[in-house]
């Protein structure tokens, strides 16, 4: 799956909701970037027989740049449909102090290792604004998330990779508090926990309205989650320092 496909889904959703459009409508473009770091990235593949490794603890990693883009369509004031493309790819290097079984390949102790962790996320969201006050809004919705992921280890002519393409539903939420004429607090995200695993992607940010069309944001995002089953054990945590801009285009 790639960005053009998710945009086609968004266009289809917009066509469907336009059929019921009777009033206010707005397009919003969110552009987000900044610096991120790994909190932890723990892996055991296969889940029932591989070696437990902490990529961030046992190998070297550096802060990395990131970017995200989201396109939203709000209609009838309370309904919002959006698509998000959130790529993530991190590299680690170093050596393990023991033999490592990863995806049925044995990497001997002290082998120079290059590890790559990719977790691209494509999401389609519908949200309904359940609370609208003069200074406070709250929206609740559902997100369909497609993950395109892999974990790869390579070193000394050895190479092993575990790929994953899957779908998971999440609960979406969006809260704003307009505490002054131009400043607002924003808390939004997608999250869900189940016996098979969990996922949380939450942003807390301070927003400043330049005018009716442009907002700038600065804040903190946490991305955490993983799965635990016979095939894989993988849980990761990433911290994001976020800056962004939101462009509102009335229709």
Give a label for each model feature.
Residues 31, 69-73, 124-128, 142-144, ...:
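Residues on the lipid-exposed face of transmembrane beta-strands in outer-membrane beta-barrel proteins
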Residues 198-251:
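Predominantly the C-terminal beta-signal and adjacent terminal strand-loop region
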